[in-house]
Amino acid sequence: MGSDWDEIKRLAADFQKAQLTSTLQKLSERNCVEIVTLLLEKQMLEVVFTNDGKEYITPDHLEREIQDELYVNGGRANLVEVSKTLNVDLSRIEVLAERIAAENPSVHLVLGQLIDEDYISHIAQEINEKLVQRGEISISELASQFDLPSDFLQHDVVEKHLGKIIKGRQDASNPRVFFTQAYIQRCKAKIRGALAAITRPINVAVILQQIGVQEKIFHSLLDEIAPAGQVTSKQANSQYVPHIYAKTQADWVNSFYKQNSFLEYDAIQKLGISDAKSYIRKQFPNEEFLFLKRVALGARLVELTVVTALNECSATKQYLDLTTILPSNLSEEDIEEVFSTIMAQKHSNPSNFVYLDGIVFSQPYLAQLVQPCQALAESQAKAAIDGGVYQQYIVEKTLAQKGNVSTQELEDDGKVDKRDERRKKASSGKAGGGAQGRETKTKSTKKHQRGKAAAQFDSDDEDDVQQGTRGGGGASKKAVKPLELVKTADIVKLITASLEEEGLEHLSKPIAALYTNQFNQTALARAQELFEATPQTNRRQTHAAIQDRINTLLIDIRLYEKGLKLFPQDTQTQLVKYLLKSLGNEICNELSLYVASECNLTVKNTNLNVDQRNKLAQECEAQYRAALLEQNKALNKSIDEFELATETVLKTCSMIIKKVDKKKDRLLIADHKRKLQKQLLECHEPALLLHLAALILFTTITGSILHASGKFVSAILQHIRGSLNEEQNALLLRYHDLVLQVLQATPDSNESKLANEHLQAMQTQVVELAQNFSRASVSKAD
């Protein structure tokens, strides 16, 4: 038994010895390559080959070597450099680096670099040292220094260690800037010291350049410092204005205004104030100023000196030198602007003064100064007549006017001739009709009280000639140059002596220029009077007067025709007959007498009847005879036929038919109504009063005028009855009945006396109704 146990121990020792004994057999390199290749093929082994392929290493061992390189390089290793050092492909290094960064939170992979926490702590210490030295630092500077991304530096380095390794604080307005409290205190001290030393406005950029403080820090700390001044803005060109300077400005402006009562914009701008007007308003809120282009005048200066002096100048009928009462600093332009502004504000009547080179003349003074020029105008007018100068001027103007008329006739030939239409209408035998389409050219007014004015030489002829020359096809005609009888030099000679006594002779030409046209017109008017007084002009005056008279009567007939068309046909026919027997007969008489004068026939009675005119026409020359006879016949026909016959007579007499200006119809009707109202106020005869009242009411209600005799009063009252209320109709009807009663009764009878008393009592009511009735009343009654 014991021997067996010993045998077992011996065998165990041999076995242990066999186990502990290693084989000393060595494999060749070829065998090793084959073994490794076999293991790789069977995916039993993973290795990483070097770039030259001579060596290979396991990924785990390569990972340990990368970590060793990170440690050797101080916690920051560039993967490109690691790839070169380990002689391994960069892609393999990058894969393992990503795994290292993912597995180890203390290691970061940043832009192809491995960085561990030790390195981050190291650069945090460097940043802290730099922050202590400079007081302020930005992430952009650190990114440039450490060649690391700004986001990584801000979040993983600075903000992570802020308050621990890095002793500072983050700028609230700019998170990428960090500074120390000591730096802020230094900046405050610099800003406070710089601003305290400034006594005049200075650009903020200059201040920052001198003290070396950033602009954003300057503006953020300015309110905390509470400086003795203010910054104009936060823009790049802002300025700092100390309170002492603003006070100095205000004191200077107040002192200057107190002494002079005005302020110059240039002087204020030299103080550094850009908007002078706004500054003046702000500095003197309770003062009123007259703001001119160059200066601002105090309202007290204007009121107490200039306005008062102008009023005195007007009262004394003298002149005023404004330079003697205004500050000497003001230029001539300033003084003229002061005067113009005062006149615009209606402190005085502008028409009472004339301003010339700082001198204000009252109109009475100038009127007295140029009084001798009246005699000059008279003498020049006589000289123009005696020398034939004015007569030549009249001839040239007349020729120019005739040329203009010819041009108008040529233009009218191209238009539709409405007179042909009127001839067709007249041939149909209809009574009534109008003057539409008739060629007219007149400033027509009511028939009454216009004959005398029409006989005068038309002062508008010259203007008509010029307008016609400019406006139509008469381009070859030239306007007559105005005749200059009184010249500026003539007036200068007369007024220079008086002005020399006042030392104002340098203003003689400007004053003369003001009155040259006035006295020239006076001389022309006087020459016209002298010219019209000469025998050779009588014939021309007669022709012009007759022409205007006939045109005026034709316009009256046209307007009356519109009114009578509002009546029934039977009444209308009677009104047409009355119109032709009155105004038509007057036209026939005027033309017959004119033709008789042209034919050198003597007519004793100027109020001709139809037979007398026919007899006179037979004695006239052949060119007039047929036209006059036809016109006489037309008196018993329609208005259109009479107008056509009248136009024929006018053409044979070389008279112009003026065009219709319907725009003036309303004015003519209003003028006619005013004349009727004036006659009504002066009338005391009941029948005539009723007649006038009826015509006025008809014009007011219809907007047309009517030529009717007293026998048509009842028809007129019947026509306007619908536009009046019951009380008004009753008044007119009662008055009409009383008038008939008076006319039918014996003048001395009791019936006539009683009717007259009633008429006298009702007269005021009838007059008031006619005078005060309006279109508004018409609408209300309707």
From Swiss-Prot:
Disulfide bonds: none annotated. The keyword Transmembrane helix does not apply. GO terms for molecular function: UFM1 ligase activity. InterPro entries: Ufl1 (IPR018611), Ufl1-like_C (IPR056761), Ufl1_dom (IPR056580), Ufl1_N (IPR056579). One of its GO terms (biological process) is regulation of proteasomal ubiquitin-dependent protein catabolic process. It holds the Pfam family E3_UFM1_ligase. Residues 405-478 are annotated as: Disordered. The keyword Kinase does not apply. Its EC number is 2.3.2.-. Keywords: Transferase, Ubl conjugation pathway. One of its GO terms (cellular component) is endoplasmic reticulum membrane. Belongs to the UFL1 family. E3 UFM1-protein ligase that mediates ufmylation of target proteins. This is E3 UFM1-protein ligase 1 homolog. It comes from Drosophila simulans (Fruit fly). The lineage of its organism: Eukaryota, Metazoa, Ecdysozoa, Arthropoda, Hexapoda.
